[in-house]
Every structure is written in C-alpha cells, then in structure tokens.
Amino acid sequence: LVCGCNALLFSGKVVKSYNRWFNKTLSMLQSIKDRQGIDKLTNRMRKMYDKRERFMNDAMHKTSRRIVDYLVSHHIGTLAVGYNKGWKQSVNMGGVNNQKFTFIPFARLRSCLRYKCELAGISYVEHEESYTSKCDALAMEDICKHDSYLGKRVKRGLFKSAVGKVINADVNGALNIGRKVFGDSFMITDSGRWYRPERINVLKCV
C-alpha cells in the first residue's frame, strides 16, 4: 500500500506458512485415502477444508479492515487496486509457488476491500496491472511493454531503479498502479518515503 504519506507492506508469511502446512498434511491424508481405496473426502480432510476456509476469511477481513482503517485515519478518499483477469487460472510459477499463490484468495480480499471502502465512503477502483512490476516507477518509465526495461530486480523482493535507488519490488509495482490510475503526478520521486516501507503482520498485531 502506497500513498502520499507512507508505504506499507502487509506480510503474507502467516498465510503462506499455513498453506505449506495445509498442502503437506492434505497430501499425506490423500495418500492414505488412496491406499485404503476411499473415494470420498474423509472427515479429517473435510474438517481441514472447513478450518482453512475460516482461517482465510479471518485473514482477508483483518487485512482489509487494517487497510481501510489506515485510509480513513489519513483522510485518503480513493483506493486503487491492481488486478489481472484469470490471475489464479493462468499463472505458472512452478509447483511449489503455484500452491502458495493459488491458495491465497485475492478475489476475496478485493471483495472485502470493496465493501469496506463503500461503508467508509472511500472510492474503490480496480485497474489492470500489466507491466507494473517490470517498469521503473522512480524513473517514470512508460508503463507498457519494452524490449528492455530501465530498472531490474536485483534480488528477491528488491527492485533497482535507473535513478540508482533500490526499493521494495512490491512498492515499485504499487507506485506504477497509482500512476496508471492517478497519473504521474501521483509520484514524488525525490522523497525518501518509498525506500523504507513499514512492514505490518496483521494476523499478529490484531
């Protein structure tokens, strides 16, 4: 989340950790079920799915509540959210990464954000986010496909800009989504606020 006064990173570590446990345990139970020749879901598997549904609902509601509360407290009137059609259907990042990604209900998070924004009187805008992660926000690179890009990822989670600054890759993407929705005036490139985002773990602090 980036705005005129801060950059926030909402940690997904707890959700990813839960997904790892869920996938590993479910795989073990599936193997046992297959060996025993059982066709239907076992009671334990059904309980696991129910528990995961409650966990994800709780995580999405807490995250969306924290975001909207922040917007209200800082008098921010519009929330712009990046979105790609077929996000979970077409993504292919390898087996392990696919499991982590597709088990996070982003559509549910967007839905929670939308109705909480409406209740708070905040305008909610979704915009396609193509090329926002590749283009250099700090260098005001045009957000479109290029043969070569001004900036690049230098290591996991970090993006090196052509202006010589290194920022969090998610912050770079969020800035570009803001540019798509609000125009380049959204950016203040000489500010240091983007370089040290505040990290928030909602599931631990709520």
For the regions a protein language model found, what residue spans apply to each?
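Positively charged, helix-rich recognition surfaces that bind polyanionic ligands
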Residues: 1-206
